[in-house]
Structures are given as C-alpha cells and as structure tokens.
Amino acid sequence: MGKIRNINYINQIGIKKVLCHTNMGNTIYILNNGQKYKEFSEDYRDLSDSINREFQESLLQQTDEYGHSIISYPEIVISSKKELFGIVGTFEQGTPLLEIDPLIQIDYLLNLIDRLEEGIKDISLKGWNLEDLHEENILINPISKTSPIRIIDTDYHVLQLQKDRLELYRTNMKRIFSAIITSIIPSICKSNILKDKDVEQQYVLASNGVIKVSDFLRYLLFKIKISTKEPLTIKTLQKSI
C-alpha cells in the first residue's frame, strides 16, 4: 500500500525553486521534473510520535488514490524509519474558487460543479472524509481541457472505512456547498430570495448535503428568471440575488 521513498529521491531530482511557505510552517518546492514537493515542518517529522505515524499512514493511503479525476492526491511520501519529510505530487495550476472570475458563464460553472460532485461521490463511496476542504483548496483552470477543476491540499483527508458512506457523502457535500456559495453568491443569506419558502427549503437541503449544490443553483436560476440577451455570468447572477 502506498509509495514511499527516502530523501535521496528529492536530492536526485533536484529542487528548481521555492514556491511558497504555508501558514502551517511547511515549504512548497517545485522540483526539476515539474512536480510539487511539500516539505513538512519539524512538528510533523518525528515518527516516534504516534500522531505523526498516523498522519504518515493516512498520506500513504492517499497515494493509492493518486490520479483521481478531481482530487490531487500525492504520488509519493518522502520518509525514513524515523522521520517524515514530505510528499510529492502534481503541481496543479489554477485560480482558487474564492477568486473565480465573475465573468465566467454560469453554464460553464455548472458543468464544473457537476464534475466536482461526481468526484466527491466517487471518493465518498470509497470511505474518504475530506477534512479541510474549502474554497481556497479548489482550483479552477479554464485553460485545461483535462483538469479544469481540482481539489488540492489534501493532507487532512482521512480514510474512514467504518463510517456510513451516505453520512460521509453528505458531510463532504456540505463542505462543497459552503465553498461554492461563499465564492459565487456570498450575499444570498441576506437576500430576499430566501424569503421564498421553496427556495429556502432547497437551500436548507443543499446546505445539509441532502441535494446537490448544482441542483440548488439550477432551481435558483429557474426561480429568479433572469432575462438577458447576453450569456448568463456569475456577475449577472450576483446582481439578481
């Protein structure tokens, strides 16, 4: 299970540049082969610590999902018998969902959300709890034909095979709902549109992961009946709420 290499793997490939430092004290590098290497801070290193050993085990389980259609899981864990150094995976490019271009057309956005929801369903049925999933960990890349939407920073995704799959699915869908609504229509909670009982009911169902956020957005578009000769964009929707 999982792929593990020692630190010589990084030394042999070589580091091209430092990409950034995270607020958790980790450092992100781009390697000479184009991959991303996340080097963990000292807090994660010591494998005599049971919490760090569990963290490494979870990361190794994630490598079994490398190549997932939506989620950018690591390919390799860099470790020794005593130390956990970091993880290597694909360097994903794109714009965080929170900073999505408001001129993107709604039809395109809904297509992306459909793909995202299918990926969430797939990974939830396998028993994954996608902790720390939020609007800054979802990347949009309209230029890419193969990976226009990706979930990154999966360190705290946890495989929970003992959990009910429907419960996991709804938990993960609640996170997706929060990320999308926060990014696309953050003002909806203050809007008069939720005074419509039918809209409010659909909103509550979607916010609890009972129905898909894409279905809620399509229902919302149906209810507000936006009239425009131009392609409908996120900005148009925001102004109509």
Language-model features and meaning:
Residues 1-16:
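A short, low-complexity linker immediately N-terminal to eukaryotic Hanks-type protein kinase catalytic domains
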Residues 12-73, 77, 100-102:
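ATP-binding glycine-rich loop module of kinase domains
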Residues 29, 115-116, 138, 148, ...:
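Hydrophobic transmembrane helix bundles of membrane-integrated enzymes that assemble
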Residues 69-112:
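Conserved structural core of kinase catalytic domains
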Residues 106-125:
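Amphipathic alpha-helical segments that line or abut small-molecule/effector binding pockets
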Residues 120-142:
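Catalytic-loop of the protein kinase fold
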Residues 143-241:
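C-lobe/activation-segment region of protein kinase-like
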